[in-house]
Amino acid sequence: MMEMKPFENSKKIAFDLFYVQMVWTLWYVSFLFVVQFMMLLLPDFIKLNVSDAESPASMYFMNFGLTASKTYMLVIGIISSYAFLKHYIHQGVTRKDYFVGSTIAVILLSILLPILMWILSGVQYLILGWAGIPRQESVVIGYEMFSLMPFIIFTLQFLVYYLAGWMVSMSFYRFGFFGGMLSIPVGLAGLILLDMVWGGRDAEKLLSDWLPIYPIELTTTTAMLTSLVLAAVFILLHRLISRNIVIKIK
């Protein structure tokens, strides 16, 4: 049983959850890094039906891993409620302490992942330069790869994706299958809006046959504020759903 002060509980939970998910993330980025290198070194054996601008050889690792990393954050957000909530509540942690600690861990993880991708992009740049492997130097979002802005943009997007998955999984945990299904359109709408304000094409490619989805021309500041609002909405929804949740024994 945890008998520390409430804030001490939250800090310990934040550290524990951040550490566990950091280990997952290190395995994930290592795997993704190896996958892209295989695509670069064996282009004749690994062919993708994409344009030259979209091929792995045209991107540094940070750009190559953007879409996959958003999906990764969504998935571990979905996993988190089922993986951690019951354990901590059974240890005597209050729902509020768990919520605060989890939120801190999510923010830290959303900062860590772009840092890891940033570092590996630099490693990749040095290795490919040393090996003499030619490549284009395209940058997805129009900023220099090693400036601060891509780091901020990636952090915000990863945060919102995790929080969307977190909110959806908590809805399934509390309300069951049918109640949880109602949360999916809410999460999906938030992610579509996020993709649109950042001028991404992921939502457009997936859903343009069914929905009128187009990138929205916004300033970077407005897009950042929109991302923060979406993050706040998902955090609030998660808190409302989890506040009086009944923990399942099995």
Residue ranges and their predicted role:
Residues 75-95:
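Transmembrane helix boundary and interhelical loop/hinge segments in multi-pass membrane proteins
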Residues 1-58, 197-250:
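Hydrophobic alpha-helical transmembrane segments
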Residues 71-78, 156-164, 226-238:
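Hydrophobic cores of alpha-helical transmembrane segments in multi-pass inner/ER membrane proteins
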Residues 15-27, 31, 96, 100-113, ...:
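Alpha-helical transmembrane segments of multi-pass membrane proteins
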Residues 37-67, 105-175:
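Secretory targeting signals
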Residues 59-81:
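Long, hydrophobic alpha-helical segments
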Residues 93-97, 169-179:
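Membrane-interface helix-boundary motifs at transmembrane edges
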Residues 177-191:
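Central hydrophobic cores of alpha-helical transmembrane segments
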